[in-house]
Regions:
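Loop-to-transmembrane helix entry
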Residues: 50-64
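Glycine-rich segments within core transmembrane alpha-helices of 12-TM secondary carriers
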Residues: 171-189
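Extracytoplasmic
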Residues: 18-52
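Intracellular juxtamembrane helix-capping segments at the cytosolic ends
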Residues: 152-165
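C-terminal ends and interior cores of transmembrane alpha-helices
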Residues: 93-131
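Central cavity-lining transmembrane alpha-helices of secondary-active solute carriers
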Residues: 60-77
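Small-residue-rich segments within alpha-helical transmembrane domains of MFS-like 12-TM solute carriers
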Residues: 31, 35, 131, 135, ...
Length: 189
C-alpha cells in the first residue's frame, strides 16, 4: 500500500514565519496610515480651513462604519464565505481606495473642483455638520472606507495566522502579530 505524503507550505517553518512577517507588516503599515495626518493637524487648519471639530470628525470617521453600521460583523461573514485570500484582497482594495480618497481630499487637485463645490452644501447631517470643509468631508469618507478595510484586514490576519500556525507556534505568532500595532504607538512624531 503506497501512501502519498503531501507537504503543504504551512508545514515549512520558513514559509510560516515569512507569512507572519508579511501579515504583520501589512497591519503595521495600515496602522501607521491611520495616524499619518495627526502631525499635520495645524497645517490642515491653516491651509484647508479645518477647525478642531472638522479634524475630530475626520479622525473619528475611521471607526464610524465599523461601529454604527456594524461593518465588522459583515466583514466576519464575508471572511467566512469567501476565505482568507479573497478577504485579504478585498480589504487591501478597500484600504487603497480609502487612502486614495483621503490623499485626494487634502491635495490641491481637490480644491475648487466639482466635488469640492458639491460637498460644500451636501451631506450636512450626521456624522458631518453644516460648515464642515468639503475637503474634511471627503477625507472622512475616504477614512471610513479605509477603516473598513483595516478592520477587515485585522480579523483576516488573525484567521490567516490560525490557518498557518494550527498545531504549531500559534501563541507566539499571535503575540508577534500584536507587536506590530503596539510598535506603531512607540513611533515618535
Amino acid at each position: 500500500m503506497t501512501e502519498k505524503i503531501y507537504k503543504l507550505l504551512k508545514d515549512s517553518p520558513a514559509m510560516r514565519w515569512t507569512a507572519l512577517v508579511l501579515l504583520a507588516s501589512a497591519m503595521f503599515f495600515a496602522y501607521m496610515f491611520v495616524d499619518i495626518l495627526s502631525p499635520l493637524q495645524a497645517m490642515l487648519q491653516e491651509t484647508k480651513g479645518w477647525d478642531p471639530a472638522a479634524y475630530g470628525t475626520y479622525q473619528g470617521s475611521e471607526t464610524f462604519l465599523n461601529v454604527f453600521v456594524f461593518f465588522l460583523i459583515f466583514a466576519g461573514i464575508i471572511l467566512d464565505k469567501i476565505g482568507v485570500r479573497n478577504t485579504a484582497l478585498l480589504s487591501g482594495a478597500l484600504m487603497v481606495i480609502g487612502a486614495y480618497l483621503k490623499y485626494w481630499a487634502v491635495s490641491d487637485g481637490f480644491t475648487g473642483g466639482a466635488t469640492d463645490e458639491y460637498l460644500k452644501n451636501f451631506w450636512n447631517f450626521f456624522p458631518f455638520y453644516e460648515g464642515m470643509p468639503s475637503s474634511a468631508k471627503m477625507a472622512a469618507l475616504g477614512f471610513m472606507i479605509f477603516g473598513c478595510g483595516v478592520e477587515m484586514a485585522g480579523i483576516t490576519v488573525s484567521k490567516g495566522i490560525v490557518k498557518w500556525f494550527k498545531g504549531k507556534e500559534m501563541a507566539l505568532a499571535m503575540g508577534l502579530k500584536w507587536l506590530s500595532p503596539v510598535s506603531v504607538l512607540q513611533q515618535p512624531y
